């Protein structure tokens, strides 16, 4: 089972990702985050294998977030909704 988080500043994007992740039997949604700072908090407390990430977010962008990671999970970037 791969533990993953979804990071998107738009609620629709988070909801679509949640629906997709729940359909894949080997994925477990550990958290939905509205921004990169929330995702950083989740990563501090939980081991995450897979990250679904929006690139264009206010504040810390998706690319800046990736650069800040010390342990790199598998990353899936911007799904272009």
Label each PLM-derived region with a short phrase.
Residues 4, 46-52:
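Active-site beta3 strand of CheY-like receiver
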Residues 4, 29-30, 74-75:
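Hydrophobic/aromatic residues located in beta-strands of well-ordered beta-sheets
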Residues 8, 54:
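Active-site residues of response regulator receiver
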Residues 57:
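Receiver (REC) domain active-site loop signature in two-component systems and cognate sites
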């Amino acid at each position: 089972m791969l533990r993953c988080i979804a990071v998107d500043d738009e609620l629709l994007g988070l909801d679509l990702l949640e629906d997709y992740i729940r359909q894949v039997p080997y994925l477990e949604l550990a958290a939905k985050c509205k921004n990169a700072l929330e995702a950083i908090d989740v990563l501090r407390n939980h081991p995450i294998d897979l990250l679904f990430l929006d690139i264009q977010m206010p504040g810390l962008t998706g690319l800046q977030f990736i650069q800040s990671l010390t342990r790199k999970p598998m990353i899936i970037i911007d799904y272009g909704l």
